[in-house]
């Protein structure tokens, strides 16, 4: 049996590109790279985002076991979670083009963000934060609360209330939602990250390639669930993580296997003539991938995928191009659909 990747029309043979554990950085090396990524983002990205969103102070307050989603993008590689109550404050001086990063916490926040909290001078952590804010006298104080984006809605009510209770009335009037800043911080990749991301995508496709090969799939024997758990095991052996459970489903001439991620696959055993679809991603070096691919299982008398599948892929790719050609800044998805 040979599998055919419809996505780029390459026949899979027994010889496949395999991603091995030695291609993955050690935990120690990963820590070094993550620190470099974070420093690059602090130095080159955050000042730009704060200036463009008009927030000159961004305060992130989070607690152990109940972390703000944004804090997970900032955690030093030696920190697996926040510690007790962790407070970070970023102040951008637009005139001086300078970003000050501080932690109002018991410890420095890794190598990039020093702690400035002197408990002997001010034992109350929240009062120490307010003192720092007053010294900087920002125009806008951004906090992570949002009606629309969960990733930008990380501050809990108790911390929000505690902060405002310690602020003067004039200072509390400066508090605004950091929604736009938080979302842009999450969605924006630096040049350094994009170079690394290419490697993540290569690793992801390598795992899919191996999963869609005769090393893993024997038609008439292997189930879609077998492939799913092979992928999970492969990721574990490589020392990586998945950030969502993989999906493997089958499309046939009969009713397609569209179970919408909420049930068991109707087509359990993979057979010749099946079109296999996967949705799979990994987490590595603070980045996530999310890749989907198709593979066609050749019938015994076939050497290539049927013409109708090849044409269907071409049409699907054409639709993708139509959509992407209409992408414009601040244009909504519904607007693009209407124009397409």
Set out the residue ranges of the language-model regions.
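Bacterial Sec-dependent N-terminal signal peptides
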Residues: 1-22
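Active-site neighborhoods and metal-handling regions in enzymes and metal-associated proteins
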Residues: 22-340
């Amino acid at each position: 049996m040979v599998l055919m990747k419809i996505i780029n029309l390459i026949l899979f043979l027994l010889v496949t590109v395999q991603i091995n554990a030695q291609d993955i950085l050690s935990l120690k090396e990963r820590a070094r790279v993550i620190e470099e990524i974070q420093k690059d983002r602090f130095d080159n990205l955050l000042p730009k985002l704060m200036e463009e969103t008009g927030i000159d102070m961004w305060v992130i307050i989070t607690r152990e076991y109940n972390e703000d989603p944004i804090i997970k993008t900032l955690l030093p590689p030696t920190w697996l979670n926040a510690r007790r109550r962790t407070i970070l404050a970023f102040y951008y001086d637009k005139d001086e083009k300078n970003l000050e990063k501080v932690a109002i916490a018991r410890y420095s926040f890794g190598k990039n963000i020093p702690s400035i909290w002197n408990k002997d001078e001010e034992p109350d952590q929240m009062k120490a934060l307010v003192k720092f804010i007053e010294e900087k006298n920002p125009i806008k104080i951004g906090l992570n609360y949002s009606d629309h984006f969960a990733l930008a809605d990380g501050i809990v009510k108790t911390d929000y209330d505690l902060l405002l209770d310690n602020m003067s009335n004039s200072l509390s009037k400066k508090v605004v939602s950091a929604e736009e800043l938080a979302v842009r911080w999450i969605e924006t990749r630096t040049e350094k990250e994009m170079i690394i991301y290419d490697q993540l995508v290569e690793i992801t496709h390598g795992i899919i390639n191996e999963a869609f090969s005769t090393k893993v799939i024997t038609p008439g024997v292997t189930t879609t669930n077998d492939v799913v758990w092979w992928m999970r095991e492969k990721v574990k052996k490589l020392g990586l993580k998945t950030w969502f459970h993989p999906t493997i489903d089958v499309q046939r001439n009969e009713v397609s296997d569209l179970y919408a991620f909420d049930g068991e696959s109707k087509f359990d055993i993979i057979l010749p003539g099946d079109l296999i679809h996967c949705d799979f991603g990994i987490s590595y070096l603070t980045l996530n991938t999310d890749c989907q691919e198709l593979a066609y299982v050749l019938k015994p008398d076939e050497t290539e995928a049927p013409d109708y599948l090849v044409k269907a892929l071409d049409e699907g790719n054409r639709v993708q191009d139509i959509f992407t050609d209409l992408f414009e800044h601040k244009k909504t998805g519904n607007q693009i659909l209407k124009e397409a």
